[in-house]
Amino acid sequence: MTKFTNFFAKLISIVLGILILLNISSIIANDKIALFLTKNPNNTTSQLLVYSLIALGGILMVVGIMALFKLINKLSDKGLTILAIVLIAIYSITTIANIFLFPTIPSSDSFYVQDYAIKMARGDINIIDGNDRYFGKYSNNNAVVLILYYLFKAFFFVGQDNLLWVGRIFNSLCIIGATVLFYFAIVKFTGKKVTATKFLLLSVLLPSVQFSSSWVYTATICMPFIGGIFLCGANLIKATTRKSIIINSAIIGVLSVVGYKVRPVVIFISLAGIICMFFWAFKDKKKLLKSAFSLAICAVVACTSFLVCKGIDNHYYTGSNKQFPITHWIAMSLKGDGDYDLQYKNKHEAMNSTEEINKDSIKDIKNTLNSYTPLTLFKHQYKKSSLMWSEGSVGYYTRQKGINTYRSFNDYICGPKKHMLMMYCQMLWLAFNILIIVYLYKLFRNKSSKKGLLLAITLLGALVFYMIWEVKINYALPFVPIIIAMATMGGISIENKFAVPELTTKKYYKTAYITVATLFIALLLSNIYYVSYSQVIRKTPKIENFASVSNEINNVSQHNKVLKQTFYADSDFNKLSFFSIAHPDNPSSKYKITLKNSKKKVIAEKTYSSHYTFEKTKNVILKLPKTYSPTHNEKFTLTIKGLGADSDYQEFNYSDSSQIDCLPGELKINGKPINGDLKFGLFYTERTTLMSLPAYLTLIAIIALAEALVYISLFKKKNYNLTKR
């Protein structure tokens, strides 16, 4: 390394290291995860207990990963290949099984994107209309709409009409393909199959990406573009022939531009590659010529790809004079936690032009920044970072909310019993971040290799970008493979430390491990009261049509409207909750809500007064006198009847089902069929504990056994040479 390159590597490792340390603190002190286990935001003792469990669990996960790595080291080259195939198969099965276990109702942007692509594929429309309420504001999803359109059109042409499932399978293949591409890229990048196999192992151990496969959106569809760029970049490093340089450079050019159109964050790894290429070729004439040739090919192909993409976009998109400018997202990111702000969106949606929105956004940016002190700005950025990067689940459960079919397995993945899986993901996520710190420490100390900069710069780019952009927890998904790759290499940097020959050092490691493992079990035992004795209200969704796109049903009470929704259920429930919006300025309204079973028998009925009910709950809730147990997939009829008043306090909503049928059933308003379904949820609520005492003690016993196996595995004398694999 030159002095400048060495300085740059140290600078990157220090800056990224500080950001990762901040992430580690927010991973440990994650209130949301703590509430999954305590259900009591005011119980400081129980929350501190959960924080301690996450911290110790993360450390134990690091040690457990070292034990698994040691087992992988024993395999021959053929054994590594077989294990890699098995791991890819497990990853693929988990990803695809998720879309069948959780065929969620599309929500938010995913709904708009798929709905529009299906309309185009079926020939209902042939353009992306800039006058549309959604695409008039956002043109950044045009590329994914067109990709899905061509895909859907091909399947529709051969007679496949269930295009929603086509999208889910395609999304699953994108996730699987990205992981496979990363595997081959790491083989090329490091020259060691064992490293790539360990990457696959960690990818399988963290289920967050696989469980996001039902969410058909750019965050997952862009992942194979990142993986492809990484693989081609690794090929370029090893390339010795002009043909290889041309092919890989051209592919990078295409993937960078198309990937950027799908989701702009794809460009980070391309920019990181250019920066690393500069350092790689610095003061080396032969490498400099190779880099210049590669960049020239990449630039020519990228420019051509950009013009082609621009032409396709102009062909299909009519344009809009009310698109949200970049400043809108920056201004939104400075408010609150930096999350999506519905009120701010509505404010700009009401404006007349992009120029007006841009001026208002710039004004808000200046005013907000002026209102911050350095301390409050730091707190704001810390909250943003915590929201996006501090949860090991990457918020997959937020994309599994909309369901029209209940399976008991749902409870443990995304339902009320998901707390243990969330804790597991959190501990593993903490372990990954700890291993990234090790990776960065090695980068800081290393004076010979510049390869490690590629992933570090990419991740740093993502972290910095989302400091100035709107954040959502799911937006971290495209970077999970990069985080796992860095964690894998960090783990390899320290795994041999657990098998050093010096007796005193081995005793030190043994003592430290036994202490942490024992303390972890002790904390689990001390948590028995909160897990197995403290009562909580468990709310299990059986049907949930809340997250999809809303249409208003106005004046239900004032005009004596009758809403009638049929639906099907096959498991116990005792409560209904409606997606409705309260209007405090209209306090006088009454509604009669009736639920009948398949035999037309009334099983729940109540007349609601706004003053009596809505002021307390801010929502409409129908409780059954007792739990109802349906026969197999029984049909129910839900009726909401307005009783007449001067105005409506409550505004009911229904989901637009012109292309995507959210619920099996039918909605009628005053006897007229509506192309949609009422937005409501069917639930079973009960007072219970988080986990029964026998189940919790069994879990603790399994963890103790795993700790013992890790101890036996790690502290053997034999070590394995990895240099040739």
Question: Can you say where each PLM-predicted feature lies in the sequence?
Answer:
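Start-transfer (signal-anchor) and selected internal transmembrane alpha helices
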Residues: 1-97, 289-300, 512, 516, ...
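Membrane-proximal lumenal/periplasmic loop motifs of glycosylation machinery
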Residues: 100-108, 124-146, 168
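Membrane-interface anchor segments at the N-terminal boundary of transmembrane helices
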Residues: 43-55, 166, 384-455, 683-700
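Multi-pass, polyprenyl lipid-linked donor-dependent membrane glycosyltransferases
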Residues: 167-174, 198-233, 259-269, 475-480
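Membrane-proximal stem/loop segments at transmembrane-domain junctions that anchor or position
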Residues: 123-127, 313-402, 613-615
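Short hydrophobic/aromatic helix or loop-helix immediately within or flanking a transmembrane segment
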Residues: 115-118, 133-160
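Transmembrane-helix motifs of polytopic, lipid-linked glycan transferases
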Residues: 169-190, 228, 434-442
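Loop-to-helix entry region of an early transmembrane alpha helix in multi-pass inner-membrane enzymes
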Residues: 138, 142, 156-180, 419-428
